[in-house]
Amino acid sequence: VLVAGGLVLWRLWRWRPWACRQRPDLLGLMLGYAWLGVGLLLLARAWWQQPHASATLHAFTIGALGALASGIMLRQAILRARGRPEAEPLLLPLALLFSLAAVLRLLALEAGQHWLALLWGSALAWSLAWGLTAWRLLHWRRRTVRRRLDPGQLPREGYRRAGP
């Protein structure tokens, strides 16, 4: 698992993220992919040291799944509306919010008396990221080009739907 985590991060490095500065949509997805590597490294650490088994779960679910799922959903909605994903201003900030939520959640495991404040900060960043994702999905849904049916494709009068 340690080798797999290192290979994921090495592969990400070979994609040259610094060359994609003009593509925030791709940078956001790369950030989510980086959380997969971090999660694998934390899993290897948990097998050797047993500090907090939940750290791996949080890296995968909050960091990787949050950034990748929101990024892919938004890219699909933008492309369906015939927009340009690289022009969407919130794709990278959303990935950064999910990353902030993951980092705060991981820090809460070792924070001592400040664990609750970090946990609330993580929950706030995570909720804000999903709220902004929903808002942008609605925005792009409204802009989706609706294909009109050709009058020849409309059902004829007297047509009844099959079923009960």
Predicted features along the sequence, with ranges:
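Hydrophobic alpha-helical transmembrane segments of multi-pass integral membrane proteins
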Residues: 1-164
